[in-house]
Amino acid sequence: MPKRKSPENTEGKDGSKVTKQEPTRRSARLSAKPAPPKPEPKPRKTSAKKEPGAKISRGAKGKKEEKQEAGKEGTAPSENGETKAEEAQKTESVDNEGE
């Protein structure tokens, strides 16, 4: 795209256009209509505060409680993932019977 000629450089052929000034331009951002006002934000619902002493079982926590109850019966492995000596002996005897 050709560059605009400044009035200083147009002394040659179009000398009569030197006196004409170009209109000033406004940026598109300024000439655009102002944005509509933002609507009021809706108030958020506040959750009902519960007593700190009340316990509620949720998801995985409820499952952990079930596992602890089963552990008390002696059927589940201990907390560290180690098997009890009785269970280890039972599994070894089952393995030996298959051979």
Curated annotation (Swiss-Prot):
The modification Phosphoserine is found at S6, S78, S93. Keywords: Chromatin regulator, DNA-binding, Nucleus, Phosphoprotein. Residues 1-25, 39-53, 62-72, 81-93 have a biased composition (Basic and acidic residues). It comes from the Eukaryota. PANTHER family: HIGH MOBILITY GROUP NUCLEOSOME-BINDING DOMAIN-CONTAINING PROTEIN 3, NONHISTONE CHROMOSOMAL PROTEIN HMG. Binds to nucleosomes, regulating chromatin structure and consequently, chromatin-dependent processes such as transcription, DNA replication and DNA repair. Affects both insulin and glucagon levels and modulates the expression of pancreatic genes involved in insulin secretion. Regulates the expression of the glucose transporter SLC2A2 by binding specifically to its promoter region and recruiting PDX1 and additional transcription factors. This is High mobility group nucleosome-binding domain-containing protein 3. It comes from Homo sapiens.
